[in-house]
Amino acid sequence: MPLRPPRRSSMSFIAHRATAVAIVVSIAACARNTPPMAPRPNPATDPRVGLKAGLLNAGEASSNMRVTAKVVSPPGFFGSTNSDLAFTGKYAIQGNYNGPVIWDVSDPSKPVLVTAFSCPASQNDISVYRNLMFMSAEANNGRTDCLPGGVADTVSKLRMRGVRVFDITDIKAPKLIANVQTCRGSHTHTVLEDPKDKQNVYIYVSGSAGIRSPNELAGCAGNLEADDPTSSRLRIEIIKVPLADPSKAAVVRRANIFAGLKNNPSHGLSDADKEAAAKSLAVARAAGAFIAKNPQSGADLVIPPQMIHPMLDSVVKARGGSGTANAADSAAIRGVIQAVINRTFAAAPAPSGAISDRSQCHDITVYPALGIAGGACEGHGLLLDISDPVNPIRLDAVADSNFAYWHSATFNNDGTKLLFSDEWGGGSSPKCRAGDKPEWGADAIFTIENKKLKFQSYYKLPAVQTANENCVAHNGSLIPIPGRDVMVQSWYQGGISVFDWTDAKHPMEIASFDRGPVDSTRMAMGGSWSVYWYNGSMISSEIARGLDVAELVPSQYISQNEIDAAKTVKWTYLNAQGQPKIEWPASFSLAKSYADQLERKGCVNPSRIAEIRSSISSAEKTSGAQRNAALTKLSSQLDGDRGCDAKKVDLLKKALLDLQTTVM
């Protein structure tokens, strides 16, 4: 979810800068053997290519979906970053760096603003549970009283970095009832409902900011040793929220789910990034920037002004001067800057080989019904056992040099697959250009076999985007199409993509929506931060614009019956990172969906498909004992069709029998 890579220590920042401007990059050759991927559409024919730029008047292209509404963020929030979404009842709650924005989406064609509550922080990601709303705060501008302006003091009890708890019984007037402070803030968080504990909910906190001073929050410590119980690294913080008194929410454990992980290499810059870095370096050199060699890689790096300015000030003071540094002062710094950089790199703490160089999760998706979670943890993808909420256990960990930043995770409905997204470039860079590798900044799909993750394939947005559009895999959710694994996903300015990953080795796009760049002349942030299916609609948080609502339309990939069956699934609330198990109520559209899928597979004779459909239609027109008899007869006749797809035929049979009614 970040619009930039997470903040790190000063040495890490310099190292990151070194990578960003490196001219020669060594890329570890340990990428997976990449399976065949579907070719990208021809740019000459894909309607998403070449769209007109504009903030509120950009060109648009859609395929197999229809946009039903587009609403602009309200004054005071427009121009500030829109972030993640959560849903409760008829409301969509949209995070924004200025505070939560609440929309009434009961009419998907006309979202209505309910309230926009000022409470600045980043990222202000949102979750809900009953009458409670939770909101992440990580940056130093957050205050415990929700007032703007931040906190000037380096140590202050007014600073808020953690998870806020609101009472939204009156959703028009959210009431702040608790600030749960954490050592690294809360970049994102996940609400976990334990089926065995009805008195509490739990929150897994993913913090990626620098560690706070223990003078500001007791117990915070920066020790890198994984076995140090006081360390704030290599931990996720677990908050317990007592439902009888949510104001007493508190951190109850800091769990280490990283122990024993190895450092893993990732790919370096793409060819386009190398070219851009070379140009940037040339411009910086011509402008008189301070440049040194990275002592680890030998690459040139531009020293950031925030490091140079204090050094120049020191030289000026040392000679008894004041004001702006002169040419001699600059020359003095140029003479020693390489030695300073060498010492900086040498003095930086180096974790041992047994400790991951990524010491945090970006996002954790929990699946309470199955007692498992998927941790997207920057350098690794994790499979966790969460049957005991305060003691998560790592079952497996995977790494991939094609992945730069393990960002988010989604299970399929039966929990046999797990998809991870890679936010290569941190979300603020163009990573869907023609020359960008299809396995970089993509999704990686794994099957879960004996509690282990087995890689199957990658999926990446197939449409090429421009160099002025931030684009990479981001947040999404399952669409409840029965019998299939179908997901809608945001790709920032790449728009939204709906794809089928039922066949884990061959995922395929089946619907999309995209806009042109926010600005055709420069990189300007925008696009879909997250898009989730909620009660019949796909609702997207548009970073720069507001809120979009869309719906699927029938196509060769999705039938009207499948869409109708999906719309029978209704939730009272939804946190996409707290993945609910999808269950379909009995309906004729459900049965018809399975018949459509058998036809699409092509292994049942068309005349037989027609017979099945005719029998379903006839049964639908009857009632009582007559309907029950018709459904029983058709169900028994389907046994002869199991040779095509036994699992699908059994689902159809069950759907038919579930439609039987009790006859008095």
Segments and roles (model prediction):
Residues 12-15, 19, 366, 584, ...:
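Generic alpha-helix initiation/capping and coil-helix boundary signal
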Residues 23-24, 58, 637:
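Residue-level signal for mature regions of secreted extracellular proteins and peptides
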